[in-house]
Amino acid sequence: MEQQFDYFTVTSLLVFLTFLLRLVWGWKKSSDKIKIRLPPGPSKLPIIGSLHHLIGLDVDLPYYALTDLANKYGPLMHLQLGKMSLVVASSAKMFKELMKENDLAISQRPVPYVARVLEDAGRDIAFVPYGDYWRQIRKISRMELFSVKKVQSLHYIREDQSSKLVESIRGHAGTVMNLSKAVSDYTSTVVARAAFGSGCKDQDKFIRLSLEMVAAAGAVSTLPDMFPALGFIPILSGKKAFLKSIQTEADKILDVIIDEHIQKTKSNEYDGKESDKEDIVDVLLRLEKSGELEIPITTQDIKAVIWSVFAGGTDTSSTTTLWTMSELMRNPKVMEKVQAEIREKLKGKKEIYESDIQDLHYMRAVIKEALRLRIPGPLLLPRETMEPIEVDGYVIPERTKILFNAWAVTRDPQLWENPESFIPERFIENPLDYKGTNYEFTPFGSGRRICPGMNFGIANVELPLAKLLYFFNWQLPPGMQPHELDMTAKFGVVCGRKNDLFLIPTPYNNIP
């Protein structure tokens, strides 16, 4: 009887303790919820959240709509978009608090639905989850793939392809030509040669597929990110299948490229030692062969890196070059000034090399101003909180998406005089740079998730732009005035011109 009593006593005690622990846990969770204090934002409706407030705003260019809402609700704003809890930062002060003070806590990057469709989601440079593999791929990117030394070592590719670009434009002298296509072809080929060399017989096909991939990804609905139950929409529309078919076809080409590189190392054509002319596949295979990596690199990892390079390096550089040329055509005095600098510094040269353009300070100011006024990624890439964070007196819970409206910051009249005007002089003798420490100017992001290919991207702009402005004078199509040039943007993975840029090149005659 005593044993039975002890049994029930112990059992009752365990039940009571379990109940007590649950009560305490429930109180703790409730207490945590009470502590949450989200930033202000528009009112919410059941199911759709704040989506109805975007109706009537410019949803084709969402950074416009978000800027309008931020003007009403403040520089740190909360939106509930279906299931997605989103905080939008729209000031340099909020950028600094998030990207500097809370950088570690928001080092996670949410993987969008369109990336999850692809097999390499979570292994590429852009969307790899925060953790050991992210640390490894970031170190490889900074120290091997996109270091200043590595980018400089690829000068021969940019010099070769930019010379071909000049010759191509000479063939259109005096006629209206599609400069958008010419610049896109240049950038795509430079990225391809940097990624896997110049001996790929299917290079042009892969470039075409990569451009189709970016366009197809931009066309996939974002609704499944806000309403996961609507994931069937891209399936029924055929867009998911189309995206997968492009990836499958391109992957076959990458399989051949990687295998050829492996065979090259086995046949001693490449000795496995670091070389100035290593392409990205060479570098990754060398690192894998060295045995020094904590996490082995697979073929899928190499493919994911190549896709990242194409997605991040091709459109961003060509878009920046084309927006720069567009602004120069709209501002003839700036065009005259930058051409005068280039032609004075490079006077008498029949060919231009990267070593020749290091002192073109005004041209670099022109590029910076184009990046400010026509930022390629106006909303940057989103982050996600890994734990509750406090920002400006508000408490933002774990797993909240963080969006950075860089477009609003670079147009902020409190930070920039005449922010809507193209004035490169604002960057002359000004330490303001795009490398992530000036939060009013972050075209490549900041902190742990800053774009690792920044140096590579800028290098792919500077040399071709210098050659375009040195070797040619440029005119708008007949009958068009500078203020009539269409500057409409198209939102996507990169925010470029909606319509191609057509100009008339005339060879500059004062070159011996």
UniProtKB/Swiss-Prot annotation:
Q: Which tissues and organs express this gene's product?
A: Accumulates in mature fruits and in juice vesicles.
Q: Known Gene3D superfamilies for this protein?
A: Cytochrome P450
Give the way it sits in the membrane.
Answer: Single-pass membrane protein
Q: Where in the cell is it found?
A: Membrane
Name the pathway it acts in. Secondary metabolite biosynthesis; terpenoid biosynthesis
Membership in a protein family: Belongs to the cytochrome P450 family.
Q: What does the entry list as the binding residues for heme?
A: 451
Question: Chief location of this protein?
Answer: membrane
Protein name from the UniProt record: Dihydroniloticin synthase CYP71CD1
Cofactor section = heme
GO annotations of cellular component type = membrane
Q: Which gene encodes it?
A: CYP71CD1
Main EC class of this protein? oxidoreductase
Q: Which domain of life is it from?
A: Eukaryota
> Does Metal-binding show up as a keyword for this record?
yes
**Catalytic reaction equation(s):** tirucalla-7,24-dien-3beta-ol + 2 reduced [NADPH--hemoprotein reductase] + 2 O2 = dihydroniloticin + 2 oxidized [NADPH--hemoprotein reductase] + 2 H2O + 2 H(+)
What keywords appear on the UniProt entry? Heme, Iron, Membrane, Metal-binding, Monooxygenase, Oxidoreductase, Transmembrane, Transmembrane helix
Name the InterPro entries on file.
Cyt_P450, Cyt_P450_CS, Cyt_P450_E_grp-I, Cyt_P450_sf
Q: Which residues cross the membrane?
A: 7-27
List the GO molecular function terms.
heme binding; iron ion binding; monooxygenase activity; oxidoreductase activity, acting on paired donors, with incorporation or reduction of molecular oxygen
